[in-house]
Amino acid sequence: MKLLYFNDFKLGVLKGDAVVDVSAEVAGIAHTGPGDLMNNLIEQWDGYKARLEAAVAKGSGVPVSSVRIRPPVPGPRTIDCMAVNYMEDGTRSAPAPINAFHKSPSAIIGQGDTMVLPDVPAAIFEGEAEMAAVIGKKCSNVSEAQALSYVFGYMNFIDGSARGLPPPGNVFFQMKSRDTFAPIGPYLVTTDEIANPQKLQIKLWNNGILMQNFNTDDMGHNIAKSIAWLSSIHTLLPGDIVATGTNHRGLNPFMDGDKIELETEGLGRLSFNIKDELKRTWARKTRLQCHEEAREKTPGAYPDFTPQLTGKYAK
C-alpha cells in the first residue's frame, strides 16, 4: 500500500493514478495533528489495514495530479541518518566504521516544496539521494536477524547538506539539520510491496540531468544491521525514520532554481525545488568528475567538490 497525505493533510492511498481519501477510516485514531496520526496508524496498522484496503477497493479517488501532495511522515520523533554507508561502487576496500547522526524532524518538506539554502558560508550545498526505512513498532536492542520485521515501509529521502561550515570540528548539526533539508515522499510504501530493499536502484536528476545512479546493494552496512545497531543505542518508535545513506560519487551542487527529482525503484518519484536568495553558483560537476579531473592534473589529488564560483562567500 502507498500511503500519502494530500491537500490539507487528508490521509490517502494511491490507487493507480488516483488518490483515495481514507480520512474517515482513521478518524477514530487519537491524534493532535498529521504527524502523530501517521505514527499512531503505523503502530495500530494491524487493526486498520483491512479497513483501508476495503475503502480503496470501493473508492475511485481523484487524480493524484490534481492534489497537493504533502510529506507522508510529517512528525517522526527522530530521524537517524547512516553516515558513509556505501562502498562507492567498490572503491572502498572495506565498509567505513558504522556511524550515524541525527537530523531534525523540523527539516522535513515534501513533494513540490522548496529547499532553501541559508545565508551561511558553506563550501557547497548538496543533497544526498537515499532510501529511508520507517519503523513500524517499538524497537530496542533487536538482533540483525529480527530487524527488518520492525520496518513498516520505505520512502525516498534527501539528506540536505551545507558542507564546510566553520569552525572545524563543528560539523553535523549545523550541516544537516537546517530547515527544509529533509525532503521525503511522495508516499510511504509498505514493506509487502518491496520484495528486496537491498536490491533497489536509486536515481537523482538535477534539472533533468541524471547525477546519481546506484543500487542499495552497494551499502556497506545493510538495513538490518543499521537498525540493529541504532536500536542498541536508543529506542526507535513507530514512524521514526532511518535514512540509509548514499553513494557519494554523484553528489553535485544544489543551486537557485534547480529542480531535483529522486526516484527509488518502487517508491515513486519525489520532486522539489531549490531557492537561494544569494544566487551563489558552482560548476555543475559531480564529485566523481571533480576527482577524475583533479587526478589528471595532480596524481593523488582527491577534492570532494568544486569551489564556489560567484556570489557571497566566493573566494
What are these regions (language model features)?
Residues 94-111, 127, 259-266:
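Structural signature of FAD isoalloxazine-binding scaffolds in flavoprotein oxidoreductases
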Residues 135-138, 142-157:
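RNA pseudouridine synthases
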Residues 48-53, 60-68, 95, 116, ...:
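Catalytic-pocket segment enriched in acidic/His residues
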Residues 101, 132-137, 228:
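Short, conserved beta-strand element in jelly-roll/cupin
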Residues 4, 71-72, 78, 123-125, ...:
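Residue "hotspots" at secondary-structure boundaries inside conserved domains
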Residues 1-98, 261, 281-315:
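N-terminal non-catalytic cap/leader segment that marks the start of a structured domain
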Residues 74, 110, 126-128, 237, ...:
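Residue-level recognition of short, solvent-exposed, well-ordered loop/turn junctions
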Residues 1, 68-71, 88-90, 116-125, ...:
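A generic local secondary-structure boundary/capping motif
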